[in-house]
UniProtKB/Swiss-Prot annotation:
Pfam families: DUF576. Gene3D superfamilies: 2.50.20.40. Keywords: Cell membrane, Lipoprotein, Membrane, Palmitate, Signal. Belongs to the staphylococcal tandem lipoprotein family. It is a lipid-anchor. It comes from the Bacteria. NCBIfam families: SA_tandem_lipo. InterPro entries: Csa, Csa_sf. A lipid is attached at residue 23 (S-diacylglycerol cysteine). It is found in: Cell membrane. This is Uncharacterized lipoprotein SAUSA300_0411. The lineage of its organism: Bacteria, Bacillati, Bacillota, Bacilli, Bacillales. A lipid is attached at residue 23 (N-palmitoyl cysteine). PROSITE patterns: PROKAR_LIPOPROTEIN.
Length: 266
């Protein structure tokens, strides 16, 4: 009888031990599930703005709130800065770069910026840069400076930002990225292989002269806190470059920052 009681007690201890271990294990699994990988954190940080794409009417940004911190003055509704450029090196040591930057002030509901044309040499001696002032009204780009080159004028007036036609609803499907982190800045980078079947890639090929059939790399770069920062920035690059010494890429960014600056910043 005593033997049976000891056996029953021994079995009870074993079952209790298994139950406790099982609880700890499930708890650890739960904790790990809560802690996203850096890759997931980077994608989630970008998703805050990429989920708004495509922004077919840029004036919708006047009614969109962004990340706010202590850098914003009281009453400042903030400003959206949208940017797209296309960079291409037609010959070694020379980079041609064209694009536009537009600042949409939510306080005044006005949008001003410029279209830029840059030719950059490695030695910088003969580098060339020209800006053409623009504004946006009724979702239409209006050229404020006189432009003699008719083709350039048409490119400016018909310009579309990447964010106006890009669609990243399937951002979660980009996996197995190459992630690098610089804790001193801090800055975060993630690279993902894209497919030529990707709709964003097809859109870019239809709008820009991209002679290579090479599938591009999607590069995500963040300066500042992953959770958000008005002094940091995020940059998206779709890189079609064949090799290290050549450059063929589209860069896009959409950032929210204070519209009213401190006197010390001016």
């Amino acid at each position: 009888m005593r033997y049976l009681k000891k056996l029953a007690w021994f079995i009870s201890v074993i079952i209790l031990g298994i139950f406790i271990i099982g609880c700890d294990s499930s708890s650890d699994t739960g904790e790990k599930a809560k802690e996203d990988s850096k890759e997931e954190q980077i994608k989630k940080s970008f998703a805050k703005t990429l989920d708004m794409y495509p922004i077919k009417n840029l004036e919708d940004l006047y009614d969109k709130e962004g990340y706010r911190d202590s850098e914003f003055k009281k009453g400042d509704k903030g400003m959206w800065m949208i940017y797209t450029d296309f960079a291409k090196s037609n010959k070694p040591g020379v980079l041609d770069n064209e694009g536009m930057i537009l600042n949409l002030d939510r306080n005044t509901r006005t949008a001003k910026g410029y279209y830029f044309v840059d030719t950059i040499y490695d030695n910088h001696e003969n580098s060339y840069s020209k800006n053409y002032r623009v504004e946006m009204k009724n979702n239409k780009i209006i050229l404020l400076d006189k432009v003699e080159d008719q083709k350039l004028k048409e490119r400016i007036e018909n310009f579309k930002f990447f964010g106006q036609y890009a669609d990243f609803k399937s951002l979660k499907s980009y996996n197995n990225g190459d992630v690098s982190i610089n804790s001193n800045v801090p800055s975060y980078d993630a690279k993902f292989k894209m497919s030529n079947k990707d709709e964003n890639v097809k859109q870019l090929r239809s709008r820009y002269n991209i002679p290579t059939e090479k599938a591009p790399i999607l590069k995500m770069h963040i300066d500042g806190d992953l959770k958000g920062s008005s002094v940091g920035y995020k940059k998206l690059e779709i890189d079609f470059s064949k090799e290290e010494n050549s450059e063929l890429s589209v860069v896009d960014s959409l950032n929210f920052q204070p519209a009213k600056k401190n006197k010390d910043d001016e």
